[in-house]
A protein has these predicted regions:
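Class II aminoacyl-tRNA synthetase catalytic cores and aaRS-like
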Residues: 1-270
Length: 270
């Protein structure tokens, strides 16, 4: 259809957007955050927000079916000793006094248990004034729950069923329950981290017994001071060039290590 126009009137002139509104944008984060209202139009972020909404709805429904009550606890509370510093809000009515924003509703949910609310939950907003890291931010939401007259297995079991349902409904992925468990000591011994990635194959091996009679001063000093000697098996890397080894040494120093000791053992045992 062809239309002959006698007049064209521009009601709102569109400016060129600062970055493309498209999925997997390569735009720098600071520019995306400056124009957040445009960034949130991107399909991947739209999906993230919708997924979060679905998760919240499923969590509420699951826990309600399990007999939990959703109870909102106050945001302006008394400061209590926690793992980080409190965010403080000055009181207008009581000059010189402050409220604290909750790092977690720990004391409040304990009061609920004392009050006879046997199963409580909320999607709680938490605030922690601490140094920013990749896995830390000033405010976040956590699934907060408390149960009375239960043991550890009861708590783990209900959370495992919740996770199983979420992964199935959201990701169409079946997770095996009971979920693999390990102690903090086992995680540190095997992976050197309290939140290990189980896909990582080069686990730490304790070789203290092997090197206990070694005169190498680094090993000897560690063992004499009650420490241990641990290593990883970098299979197939016996021929690694010295330049790459030196780069790994410097990389390790960046995480607080004093250096790296290494042994090259070939297939023939040499």
């Amino acid at each position: 259809i062809e239309v002959r126009a006698n007049e064209l009137r521009i009601l709102a002139e569109a400016e060129t957007p600062p970055f493309p509104i498209e999925e997997n944008s390569k735009t720098k984060e600071d520019l995306r955050l400056k124009y957040r209202y445009l960034d949130l139009r991107r399909p991947d972020l739209q999906r993230n927000i919708m997924t979060r909404s679905r998760v919240a709805t499923m969590v509420r429904q699951f826990l309600a079916d399990e007999g939990f009550l959703e109870i909102e606890t106050p945001t302006l509370i008394k400061s209590t000793p926690e793992g980080a510093r409190d965010y403080l809000v000055p009181s207008r009515v009581h000059p010189g006094e402050f409220y604290a924003l909750p790092q977690s509703p720990q004391l409040l949910k304990q009061l609920l248990m004392c009050s006879g609310m046997d199963r409580y939950f909320q999607l709680a907003r938490c605030y922690r004034d601490e140094d920013l890291r990749a896995d830390r931010q000033p405010e976040f939401t956590q699934i907060d729950m408390e149960l009375s007259f239960v043991d550890v297995e009861d708590v783990l079991e209900v959370n495992e069923r919740l996770l199983k349902k979420l992964f199935k409904e959201i990701c169409n992925f079946d997770i095996q329950t009971p979920i693999l468990r390990m102690t903090w000591r086992e995680a540190m011994d095997r992976f050197g981290s309290d939140k290990p990635d189980m896909r990582f194959g080069m686990e730490l091996k304790n070789v203290s017994d092997v090197v206990k009679d070694c005169e190498f001063v680094v090993f000897k000093s560690a063992l004499e001071n009650g420490g241990s000697v641990r290593g990883i098996n970098a299979n197939g890397q016996a021929g690694m060039p010295r330049k790459k080894i030196d780069a790994l040494v410097e990389y390790a120093k960046g995480f607080g290590a004093k250096g790296l000791a290494y042994l090259a053992i070939h297939e023939d045992g040499s």
